[in-house]
Amino acid sequence: MKALGEVFSKLVEKIRGVSYIDEATLQELSREIQRALLKADVPLDMVKTFTENAVKRMREEKPPAGIPPREYVLYILYDELVKLLGGEQPAEFKPVKKPYLVLLLGVEGSGKTTTAAKLARYLVKRGYRVGLVETDTIRPAAFDQLKQLAEKIGVPFYGERDSKDAVEIARRGVQNFKNMDVVIIDTAGRHKNEEALLQEVKMIYEAVNPDEVILVIDATVGKLAAAQAEAFMKYLPIHSVIITKMDSTARGGGALAAVIKTGARVKFIGVGEDVDEFDLFNPRKFVARVLGMGDLDALVEKIKAVFEEEKVLQEIESGRLDLLTFKKQIEGLLKLGPLSKVLQLLPGGFAAKISEEQVELSQKNLKKWYAILSSMTIEELKNPDILNASRIRRIALGAGVTPKDVKEMLTVYENLKKMSKTLKRQLRMRIPK
């Protein structure tokens, strides 16, 4: 979502730089809002309505006591964007029967097969038993792609490489997974004008009677997402939508707005290539991140889950900040996911301010340090004082780095050790027990 965040960061900076809100300022902000929304590929009629509503509120509403006018203007922008993207209520995915059948649709290239695996991974992490069914008989690579992804995430897979009957594959796949909690059925990618393929997916729908039909849409299509959704809606009911590739384009905002305009519910967004880079869509948190307000709730929950699992907090609080604890901390940070995604959760627009090169370097350093620590013996991890030149050379060789790299990591460790009391206080404030 960095690309979308960059579109709005200039608008937010403009608002925060305003000392007095008069009519001239409102007219200027109106133009800036329209410019940002059009860059995000929001449909023109929605841009006009949004701008009129937002500026009207900015003109007529008075900020509460103690709130600077510019901060209240920013709040109005946030509030109107949340409304534009579906309102305060976050999406939910709760299978209500067993097996709960999910049918995935989408045009070719929308990321549908990868999304099938991401959804499966999301559900498995929440305790559901999931089966994946591949019915794409048009694209030969689809079978192998989903089979490999299923193996990667540890989910059972059903497909028939040589069959050309997608309807029968779907029917047999559902029967094969009748004892699962959720069955996800992937279908061939279709063009919205391909009558025969659209009829085929309708036949699959009638054969298996899915509990939920999810349309997968690529964010890069922007406002054209509405046409895709409406085309599929002519053939069968669309219960919800997943927007993919939100991390790679500024047009994702337009795709979201266009889909919501059709009455469809956006349930998930894909925010990266990894199977774990997949989130339930929460308009409030999404807008906060796009505007650079961050999503500290999400960040704290991520950190809490990782560090509670490793029991690192207790070790820091007991004063045992040795290299073994340091290794667990780095492992925990790596489990949070790519640093670029973590930065998007921070307020102040950090993700937009830090270059991709800096983020990539930090990520590489964490991985390098983890390799160094993994090359040490338990004795060395627990007693860093025994690390002499000979041991450092051996560790560097085992980690595929230079002795200088090892020494630099040890310097970072020593600095962290000195700061452990401050770190302890910060963690206690951020991560309640």
UniProtKB/Swiss-Prot annotation:
It is found in: Cytoplasm. Its EC number is 3.6.5.4. Keywords: Cytoplasm, GTP-binding, Hydrolase, Nucleotide-binding, Ribonucleoprotein, RNA-binding, Signal recognition particle. One of its GO terms (cellular component) is signal recognition particle. The keyword Isomerase does not apply. Belongs to the GTP-binding SRP family. SRP54 subfamily. Composed of three domains: the N-terminal N domain, which is responsible for interactions with the ribosome, the central G domain, which binds GTP, and the C-terminal M domain, which binds the RNA and the signal sequence of the RNC. The lineage of its organism: Archaea, Thermoproteota, Thermoprotei, Thermoproteales, Thermoproteaceae. SMART domains: AAA, SRP54, SRP54_N. GO terms for molecular function: 7S RNA binding; ATP hydrolysis activity; GTP binding; GTPase activity. It is an enzyme of class 3 (hydrolase). It catalyses: GTP + H2O = GDP + phosphate + H(+). Part of the signal recognition particle protein translocation system, which is composed of SRP and FtsY. Archaeal SRP consists of a 7S RNA molecule of 300 nucleotides and two protein subunits: SRP54 and SRP19. Gene3D superfamilies: P-loop containing nucleotide triphosphate hydrolases (3.40.50.300), Signal recognition particle SRP54, nucleotide-binding domain (1.20.120.140), Signal recognition particle, SRP54 subunit, M-domain (1.10.260.30). Involved in targeting and insertion of nascent membrane proteins into the cytoplasmic membrane. Binds to the hydrophobic signal sequence of the ribosome-nascent chain (RNC) as it emerges from the ribosomes. The SRP-RNC complex is then targeted to the cytoplasmic membrane where it interacts with the SRP receptor FtsY. This is Signal recognition particle 54 kDa protein. HAMAP family: SRP54. It comes from the Archaea. GTP binds at residues 106-113, 186-190, 244-247. GO terms for biological process: SRP-dependent cotranslational protein targeting to membrane.
